[in-house]
Amino acid sequence: MPVVQCMKCTQDGKYVDQLEKLTVYDHTLSPKVKPPKFNKVPFKKIKLPDELYDDLYDEYYNLEFEPLIGGIQDHPEWGKTISGISNIKTNPHVGYAGVSDAFVEKAFDILTPIVEEWSGIELLPTVSYGIRHYPDGSVLNLHRDIIQSHVLSCIIYVDRISPENWALDYYDHQHNHHEVFFEKGDVLLYESLCVHGRTTPFEGEFYRNMYFHWRPAVWEEQFLEKYRRMKSSFRDEEHFLQYYDKT
């Protein structure tokens, strides 16, 4: 199954909120612009299919994680961040380990029809990252994903070493807050243009997961234009809720 490459979310070292030339403080952003709705409940936890579970952990236990310490951005709402990740104890840094192309292709082949059935629309795979390693002190700031390519997504939980689990903060279309916790074998299907993050600082040695992303098969410029004025980064829950109180 072909995978479409997504656009970069930075341009000339400067954050771009959605489409190029649209920054987080662009005066055209409007609280009246909200994300599309595909499902009454925009997230669902399932179990990773056995054939993917076995392949994932066969690869995982042989991986070496590399630190990604470059590319720190000075975000106007989050401060210092790498890919939306801050750290309360040190400069932001994350780790990464790639998985095989064969696993990514197999995962898209298996997961795509599952996400299509759940969302009710035909999808086109866009991008998958390897396994992301969040170190002690990490905060994943509240955000929406990239409207060109990250419209429907899934999180595959991989591993953690920590005294407590680490919640994903997810806000549905009515802006209700949900905490989602993961254990081995858990997968979260979610509408990734809904606001989400992990706002409680992580305490532990590491937390690891991976992401797969899709866009609707029909998602041309006229649909993107509809959502280009949608704000996609927020300092915290209060900022997010107050922003939409304007409507």
Model-derived regions, located:
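Non-heme Fe(II)/2-oxoglutarate
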Residues: 2-118
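Conserved double-stranded beta-helix
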Residues: 86-97, 107-167
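A structural signal for short, well-ordered beta-strand segments and their strand-loop junctions
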Residues: 45, 70, 124-126, 189-190, ...
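Catalytic core of non-heme Fe(II) oxygenases with the double-stranded beta-helix
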Residues: 136-194, 206-210, 215-230
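A short beta-turn/loop motif at secondary-structure boundaries
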Residues: 132, 203-204
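Short, charged beta-turn/beta-strand-edge "cap" motif at the junction between a beta-strand
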Residues: 194-197, 202
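Short, active-site-adjacent segments that bind or coordinate small-molecule cofactors and metal centers
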Residues: 90-94, 198, 209
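Short, cationic low-complexity segments
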Residues: 175-178, 230-247
